Amino acid sequence: MEGERMNAFPSTMMDEELNLWDFLERAAALFGRKEVVSRLHTGEVHRTTYAEVYQRARRLMGGLRALGVGVGDRVATLGFNHFRHLEAYFAVPGMGAVLHTANPRLSPKEIAYILNHAEDKVLLFDPNLLPLVEAIRGELKTVQHFVVMDEKAPEGYLAYEEALGEEADPVRVPERAACGMAYTTGTTGLPKGVVYSHRALVLHSLAASLVDGTALSEKDVVLPVVPMFHVNAWCLPYAATLVGAKQVLPGPRLDPASLVELFDGEGVTFTAGVPTVWLALADYLESTGHRLKTLRRLVVGGSAAPRSLIARFERMGVEVRQGYGLTETSPVVVQNFVKSHLESLSEEEKLTLKAKTGLPIPLVRLRVADEEGRPVPKDGKALGEVQLKGPWITGGYYGNEEATRSALTPDGFFRTGDIAVWDEEGYVEIKDRLKDLIKSGGEWISSVDLENALMGHPKVKEAAVVAIPHPKWQERPLAVVVPRGEKPTPEELNEHLLKAGFAKWQLPDAYVFAEEIPRTSAGKFLKRALREQYKNYYGGA
């Protein structure tokens, strides 16, 4: 088979290497006057253009070279969404180096660990994160230069504007060479490193931008709420640059009022982020009666969007699409849209369809498989693990052979650890993380299904459901609920769940009311902390 492939009939096509720098070069040439708008940490709104970003990215290349950065060296960033971070998104890969977007929401210990593990040579960071950098600076073994992404810097640090050098030419590295890296933000163990190639992120940006995905075009105004330190900001800065769309980068202020000001003031048509941001925005819009002037499409990722959230935004004229991915998958591998022959379904049926995770995007091979790697029936009921193959799926973890071995199946699929069902149309519906499924009396209960149903109750703002040890049933669900105003009674919530189709044995045995639910750095519920806090609640630990 390998021999047949080697002896295949040759094509006449040019062998041009894929490179992220080409996105910015095209945007500067064709859409050079298109704006890139940033809200900085000070609240100031900064305006630039693709032509200026291109020129300054070339100057950043020159400046980094003067600091000793060469092909293959790692350059880390600790920063939110703004124009300087966008310049680094292109300059670092463009010079053949590797952009390591580190997550400032990790603990200082974890940040020091990943910067040392990646052996970063230069650290670019936002000025408001100076206390964090000062706290870990003494622990960093390889960082030689600390650059504050601002006009000025305190003594002992270099200001970004002063670090810019003479314009330098890009370096055309092989398309399979590394261009970026990120570390997982899981709830167990040390973060694991994933290294992205130019080829992976170019193909990912193209596939995710198709009409049945984000459907980005030059006419769009794109505001990524997802941070640029989180899995390439779902590749939106790359994809928006690819098509020449205006970009609005919101900085660290993601409260509803600040977002609405940017949405309306800049004519934003497309945005993307995690459900918690959109739940808060929906509450704000409904309480104020405000209607967004230009927003038309909204992507939800990071965790499942409750059906009620989709319905709320659709009533406001905003189309909501689910997306799914992981750090290990660059990240997007699944996006939701309604197939043409299903458009005749009732609005309720279509809403049910939109609440599913979606369909694998082009070039991604996806299966929902049992423990032996065999696909489970496409009946919408049989549970299996989501397993993936594709040009932007990781084949392992950086410097971690043990984690690499456990992450891959014998036939080379990546094991996500996410449990799902799929139906005859191919729609995937993530039910839970493997570690978050609740096994009660030998039967499985999905915590995600319970959470999404509970958040559809008018008196529930947020809900997290966890498995708690039980002396008789092995595990039973416990729901931690943040009320919306008046606190609902357990009886009200149980009645709501029964009406939603849950059996009595699937209902939580207890409801705990709280002011907030702890979260991971990626905005997901920190269920490990809840399990630890309530482990003795049923007397089964």
Curated annotation (Swiss-Prot):
* EC code: 6.2.1.3
Indicate what this protein is called per its UniProt record: Long-chain-fatty-acid--CoA ligase
Cofactor section: Mg(2+)
* Enzyme class label: ligase
Query: Which positions bind ATP?
Result: V231, W234, G323, T327, D418, K435, K439, W444
Q: Annotated pathway, please?
A: Lipid metabolism; fatty acid metabolism
Q: Which organism's genome codes for this protein?
A: Thermus thermophilus (strain ATCC 27634 / DSM 579 / HB8)
UniProt entry keywords in alphabetical sequence: ATP-binding, Fatty acid metabolism, Ligase, Lipid metabolism, Magnesium, Metal-binding, Nucleotide-binding
